[in-house]
């Protein structure tokens, strides 16, 4: 026992990214050697994702309310530059996807059953859904994980608490510290959770089904990689005039890896919050910008909508001029910002974009169905890009405001 305990302590003290990599390797090995057992191990992944999703709504609500309630008058929260970075990044992603689709055009064989979910009829419906989510019942918003509604009520409560006594404000600060401590414990189980997710995915789905869509996946993943490694660093450099790559790789490693396997921006909010705290960012900023980013910062979704829409266009033999392609970029960017307000996310916004080219809903929904088939990779990569960019742009805005000469990466531990 005396020998086992130090080993356990050493394992717990190992960098969590290394632990996650070990979990990934172990998951692949288990799925290869014992597929049935690997499917059962998926329980660990489901528990981990459920725990993250359970703690995320209350974490966002308490942190945002406490942050706004305790904000001093005239204090700069850096939210405006963060939002600008979110919108610019999403539009650049959509433009990149258009260029990649023109350089490497994709056609599809539409011989599968159409997806059965109902897609939104237009951009007005998407905006309408988002507006109604803002005024959702606060209890229902917390229960259903409606982060737009949670943000709205948390901001309203925080503003209302401006005139409260210091003792009342202190209660919310203490509550936010308690919730943050719970999140820290949940995140420590990430290696086990990701082990379960990888085991289940490899054992149940495999990647043989993806071979037929290799070109489509290459365009999607290539576009996302270009945004993550070229465009986003360029945006950060223009904003800060400092080397962006240490921060880029940190965000991809510590936020993107977890998001890739959880496939949920909402579930990754606690992970991003913890990373922002390690980077010593302003709590007033990241407590709002991270959950907001999970809602509107959707570079990956913009790429998915654009690439699959142009694949449908190529398949239907429709000619696309430059003006229409630019319009598609704008529609995809705006639609992507509303992806969190649509059941099925970015995929079910594809028919909306296809309507620009007169493509029938039947064909568009078959493209959506292909999206679900490749979702094991597409959705994972999309979420990793979306979620890691939340931390990237939040850090860039905070560092620019703090000191323009300090390096971007300054973790406290």
Swiss-Prot record:
Superkingdom as given in the UniProt entry: Bacteria
Keyword vocabulary terms for this entry: Amino-acid transport, Cell inner membrane, Cell membrane, Membrane, Symport, Transmembrane, Transmembrane helix, Transport
GO CC terms of this entry: plasma membrane
InterPro entries: Na-dicarboxylate_symporter (IPR001991), Na:dicarbo_symporter_sf (IPR036458), Ser_Thr_transp_SstT (IPR023025)
Reactions performed catalytically: L-serine(in) + Na(+)(in) = L-serine(out) + Na(+)(out); L-threonine(in) + Na(+)(in) = L-threonine(out) + Na(+)(out)
Membrane topology annotation: Multi-pass membrane protein
GO MF: neutral L-amino acid:sodium symporter activity
Residues annotated as transmembrane: 15-35, 48-68, 82-102, 141-161, 178-198, 216-236, 290-310, 330-350, 357-377
Record flagged with keyword Transmembrane helix: yes
Record GO biological process: serine transport; threonine transport
Any Pfam family the entry gives: SDF
Record localization: Cell inner membrane
Family recorded in the similarity comment: Belongs to the dicarboxylate/amino acid:cation symporter (DAACS) (TC 2.A.23) family.
The protein's role, per its UniProt record: Involved in the import of serine and threonine into the cell, with the concomitant import of sodium (symport system).
UniProt-recorded name of the protein: Serine/threonine transporter SstT
Organism taxonomic ancestry: Bacteria, Pseudomonadati, Pseudomonadota, Gammaproteobacteria, Vibrionales
